[in-house]
Protein backbone atom coordinates (compact mmCIF):
# COMPACT_ATOMS: atom_id res chain seq x y z
CA UNK A 1 0.00 0.00 0.00
CA UNK A 2 2.81 2.40 0.83
CA UNK A 3 4.44 1.72 -2.53
CA UNK A 4 1.13 2.29 -4.36
CA UNK A 5 0.61 5.53 -2.47
CA UNK A 6 4.13 6.63 -3.40
CA UNK A 7 3.44 6.02 -7.10
CA UNK A 8 0.15 7.92 -7.02
CA UNK A 9 1.57 10.86 -5.10
CA UNK A 10 4.62 11.00 -7.38
CA UNK A 11 2.40 11.11 -10.43
CA UNK A 12 0.54 14.12 -9.05
CA UNK A 13 3.81 15.93 -8.53
CA UNK A 14 4.51 15.92 -12.28
CA UNK A 15 4.22 19.43 -13.70
CA UNK A 16 1.09 20.41 -15.60
CA UNK A 17 3.05 20.70 -18.84
CA UNK A 18 4.31 17.14 -18.58
CA UNK A 19 0.83 15.87 -17.72
CA UNK A 20 -0.58 17.59 -20.80
CA UNK A 21 2.10 16.08 -23.06
CA UNK A 22 1.53 12.67 -21.47
CA UNK A 23 -2.21 12.79 -22.22
CA UNK A 24 -1.53 13.95 -25.78
CA UNK A 25 0.79 10.99 -26.30
CA UNK A 26 -1.77 8.54 -24.90
CA UNK A 27 -4.45 10.03 -27.13
CA UNK A 28 -2.17 9.71 -30.18
CA UNK A 29 -1.40 6.06 -29.37
CA UNK A 30 -5.11 5.23 -29.03
CA UNK A 31 -6.12 7.11 -32.16
CA UNK A 32 -3.19 6.13 -34.44
CA UNK A 33 -1.68 2.92 -33.03
CA UNK A 34 -0.26 1.71 -36.36
CA UNK A 35 1.43 5.04 -37.06
CA UNK A 36 3.00 5.17 -33.61
CA UNK A 37 4.12 1.54 -33.97
CA UNK A 38 5.74 2.30 -37.34
CA UNK A 39 7.58 5.26 -35.81
CA UNK A 40 8.91 3.06 -33.00
CA UNK A 41 9.99 0.31 -35.41
CA UNK A 42 11.78 2.84 -37.64
CA UNK A 43 13.80 4.18 -34.75
CA UNK A 44 14.48 0.71 -33.37
CA UNK A 45 15.95 -0.82 -36.52
CA UNK A 46 17.60 2.26 -38.05
CA UNK A 47 19.30 3.10 -34.77
CA UNK A 48 20.28 -0.55 -34.30
CA UNK A 49 22.15 -0.65 -37.62
CA UNK A 50 23.69 2.79 -37.15
CA UNK A 51 25.12 1.67 -33.81
CA UNK A 52 25.91 -1.93 -34.77
CA UNK A 53 27.78 -1.00 -37.96
CA UNK A 54 29.29 2.17 -36.48
CA UNK A 55 27.78 4.36 -39.20
CA UNK A 56 28.55 8.07 -39.50
CA UNK A 57 26.75 10.84 -41.37
CA UNK A 58 27.56 11.09 -45.07
CA UNK A 59 27.82 14.50 -46.80
CA UNK A 60 25.38 13.42 -49.54
CA UNK A 61 22.80 12.33 -46.91
CA UNK A 62 22.30 9.17 -44.86
CA UNK A 63 24.90 7.21 -42.91
CA UNK A 64 27.92 5.13 -43.93
CA UNK A 65 30.92 3.12 -42.79
CA UNK A 66 33.99 2.01 -44.73
CA UNK A 67 34.24 -1.80 -44.81
CA UNK A 68 36.92 -2.64 -47.38
CA UNK A 69 39.83 -1.09 -49.26
CA UNK A 70 42.01 -3.25 -51.49
CA UNK A 71 45.76 -3.16 -50.87
CA UNK A 72 46.33 -3.31 -54.62
CA UNK A 73 47.03 0.14 -56.05
CA UNK A 74 46.68 1.24 -59.68
CA UNK A 75 47.14 4.36 -61.79
CA UNK A 76 44.67 5.14 -64.55
CA UNK A 77 44.24 7.98 -67.08
CA UNK A 78 41.80 10.63 -65.88
CA UNK A 79 42.49 10.05 -62.18
CA UNK A 80 44.52 12.42 -60.03
CA UNK A 81 47.08 10.03 -58.57
CA UNK A 82 46.85 6.35 -57.67
CA UNK A 83 43.73 4.50 -56.50
CA UNK A 84 42.90 1.31 -54.69
CA UNK A 85 41.49 -1.28 -57.09
CA UNK A 86 38.26 -1.55 -55.08
CA UNK A 87 36.53 -0.12 -52.00
CA UNK A 88 33.25 -0.91 -50.23
CA UNK A 89 30.96 0.69 -47.65
CA UNK A 90 27.71 0.15 -45.79
CA UNK A 91 25.19 2.90 -46.54
CA UNK A 92 21.88 3.57 -44.77
CA UNK A 93 19.03 5.94 -45.59
CA UNK A 94 16.03 6.56 -43.37
CA UNK A 95 12.63 7.28 -44.89
CA UNK A 96 12.94 11.03 -44.38
CA UNK A 97 16.39 11.23 -45.99
CA UNK A 98 17.72 11.02 -49.52
CA UNK A 99 21.04 10.59 -51.25
CA UNK A 100 21.61 13.88 -53.09
CA UNK A 101 22.41 13.91 -56.78
CA UNK A 102 26.12 13.28 -57.21
CA UNK A 103 28.55 12.02 -59.84
CA UNK A 104 31.64 9.80 -59.71
CA UNK A 105 34.54 8.91 -62.00
CA UNK A 106 34.27 5.22 -61.06
CA UNK A 107 31.55 2.62 -61.50
CA UNK A 108 29.54 1.89 -58.36
CA UNK A 109 27.53 -1.23 -57.50
CA UNK A 110 24.70 -0.97 -54.97
CA UNK A 111 23.73 -4.17 -53.11
CA UNK A 112 20.48 -4.48 -51.15
CA UNK A 113 21.00 -5.66 -47.55
CA UNK A 114 18.01 -4.91 -45.32
CA UNK A 115 14.90 -2.79 -44.83
CA UNK A 116 12.66 -1.38 -47.55
CA UNK A 117 13.40 -1.00 -51.24
CA UNK A 118 14.69 2.27 -52.61
CA UNK A 119 14.54 4.12 -55.91
CA UNK A 120 17.63 5.38 -57.71
CA UNK A 121 17.24 8.30 -60.12
CA UNK A 122 19.99 8.14 -62.74
CA UNK A 123 20.76 10.78 -65.37
CA UNK A 124 23.13 9.22 -67.88
CA UNK A 125 25.83 10.92 -69.97
CA UNK A 126 23.25 11.65 -72.71
CA UNK A 127 20.89 13.39 -70.28
CA UNK A 128 18.31 10.59 -70.15
CA UNK A 129 16.62 10.00 -66.79
CA UNK A 130 16.10 6.44 -65.60
CA UNK A 131 14.50 5.10 -62.42
CA UNK A 132 15.78 1.82 -60.99
CA UNK A 133 14.55 -0.09 -57.95
CA UNK A 134 16.82 -1.81 -55.45
CA UNK A 135 15.14 -4.28 -53.10
CA UNK A 136 14.02 -7.85 -52.38
CA UNK A 137 10.78 -7.90 -54.42
CA UNK A 138 12.03 -9.30 -57.71
CA UNK A 139 8.47 -9.89 -58.98
CA UNK A 140 7.82 -6.13 -58.62
CA UNK A 141 10.77 -5.12 -60.75
CA UNK A 142 13.27 -4.68 -57.93
CA UNK A 143 16.79 -6.07 -58.05
CA UNK A 144 19.31 -7.14 -55.40
CA UNK A 145 22.15 -5.23 -57.04
CA UNK A 146 22.48 -2.34 -59.45
CA UNK A 147 25.42 -0.89 -61.37
CA UNK A 148 25.71 2.88 -61.77
CA UNK A 149 28.18 3.67 -64.52
CA UNK A 150 30.81 6.37 -64.08
CA UNK A 151 29.81 9.79 -65.37
CA UNK A 152 26.12 9.46 -64.36
CA UNK A 153 24.39 11.83 -62.00
CA UNK A 154 22.29 9.87 -59.51
CA UNK A 155 20.25 10.18 -56.33
CA UNK A 156 18.29 7.74 -54.14
CA UNK A 157 15.35 7.67 -51.74
CA UNK A 158 13.57 5.07 -49.59
CA UNK A 159 10.22 3.92 -50.98
CA UNK A 160 8.62 3.34 -47.57
CA UNK A 161 8.83 6.68 -45.80
CA UNK A 162 8.40 5.12 -42.35
CA UNK A 163 11.19 2.64 -42.94
CA UNK A 164 14.86 2.59 -43.93
CA UNK A 165 17.18 1.01 -46.49
CA UNK A 166 20.54 -0.55 -45.72
CA UNK A 167 22.74 -1.22 -48.73
CA UNK A 168 26.32 -1.98 -49.62
CA UNK A 169 28.19 0.14 -52.17
CA UNK A 170 31.22 -1.19 -54.03
CA UNK A 171 33.35 1.21 -56.09
CA UNK A 172 36.00 0.32 -58.67
CA UNK A 173 38.50 1.89 -59.12
CA UNK A 174 38.29 2.59 -55.40
CA UNK A 175 36.46 5.59 -53.99
CA UNK A 176 38.25 8.87 -53.41
CA UNK A 177 36.56 12.18 -52.62
CA UNK A 178 38.61 13.71 -55.45
CA UNK A 179 36.48 11.66 -57.86
CA UNK A 180 33.14 12.55 -56.23
CA UNK A 181 31.05 15.68 -56.79
CA UNK A 182 27.81 16.67 -55.09
CA UNK A 183 25.27 18.22 -57.43
CA UNK A 184 24.64 21.96 -57.42
CA UNK A 185 20.88 22.44 -57.70
CA UNK A 186 20.94 25.52 -59.92
CA UNK A 187 23.67 24.23 -62.22
CA UNK A 188 22.10 20.79 -62.63
CA UNK A 189 18.70 22.31 -63.38
CA UNK A 190 20.31 24.46 -66.07
CA UNK A 191 22.08 21.42 -67.55
CA UNK A 192 18.93 19.26 -67.53
CA UNK A 193 15.88 21.58 -67.50
CA UNK A 194 13.60 18.69 -68.46
CA UNK A 195 14.48 17.03 -65.13
CA UNK A 196 14.26 20.19 -63.02
CA UNK A 197 11.50 18.87 -60.74
CA UNK A 198 13.33 15.69 -59.73
CA UNK A 199 16.62 17.58 -59.40
CA UNK A 200 15.07 20.11 -57.01
CA UNK A 201 13.54 17.28 -54.98
CA UNK A 202 16.83 15.45 -54.52
CA UNK A 203 19.37 18.22 -54.07
CA UNK A 204 19.98 20.49 -51.12
CA UNK A 205 19.12 24.17 -51.24
CA UNK A 206 22.26 24.76 -49.17
CA UNK A 207 25.28 23.68 -51.22
CA UNK A 208 28.30 22.05 -49.62
Model-predicted segments: where are they?
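Extracellular beta-helix/beta-solenoid repeat scaffolds
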Residues: 149-151
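Cysteine-centered motifs
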Residues: 26-30
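Non-catalytic, conserved peripheral segments adjacent to functional cores
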Residues: 40-146, 155-156, 161-163, 173, ...
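Hydrophobic transmembrane alpha-helices
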Residues: 165-177
Amino acid sequence: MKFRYFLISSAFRISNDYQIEYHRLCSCICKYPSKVHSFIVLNKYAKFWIKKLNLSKHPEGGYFADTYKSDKIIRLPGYDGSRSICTAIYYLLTGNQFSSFHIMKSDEIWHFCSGSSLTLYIIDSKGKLKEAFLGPNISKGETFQLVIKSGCWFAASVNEKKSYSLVGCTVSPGFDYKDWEIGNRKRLAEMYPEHKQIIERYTSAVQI
